[in-house]
Amino acid sequence: MAWSFDSKSAVSLQIANILRLDIVRGKYKAGEPFPTVRQLAYEASVNPNTMQKSLTILENEGLLITQGTSGRIVTDDTSVIENALLILQEEYIKKVIDDGISLGLSKEKFNQLINEYYERKDTNE
């Protein structure tokens, strides 16, 4: 996986966002071991301290659980993962709507475009 970061926010926050998406998309399964700080830091080409900050964010959100010397696991509480997904979906929709409003898109036109897109997508599957 190619990791890329921008200068708009802290790298640790960007990493937390990437890993959060990976968890809610099922790359890392509920109750299963999570890669170590060193493994992820190497993969992302970042300092282990930066990766540790990112994982602490996910622990504070309840997505990761530290098991002493055994490392971390993804929470087995699927409601925590589902809630994280819902929050991400809402944030995405808010951004899309805000961008549409800034382009002069009305609610009616927005809904029309969404429905048309889904119809095209359904016929292409």
Question: Can you say where each PLM-predicted feature lies in the sequence?
Answer:
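Short, Lys/Arg-rich nucleic-acid/phosphate-binding segment
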Residues: 34, 66-74, 78-79
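A short alpha-helical element within helix-turn-helix/winged-helix DNA-binding domains
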Residues: 33-44
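Extreme N-terminal segment that seeds HTH/winged-HTH DNA-binding domains in transcriptional regulators
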Residues: 1-33, 83, 87-123
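Short secondary-structure capping/turn micro-motifs that flank functional sites
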Residues: 39, 74-75, 116-117
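Residue cluster at the C-terminal edge of the helix-turn-helix DNA-binding motif
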Residues: 43, 60-63, 103, 120
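Alpha-helical DNA-recognition elements
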Residues: 57
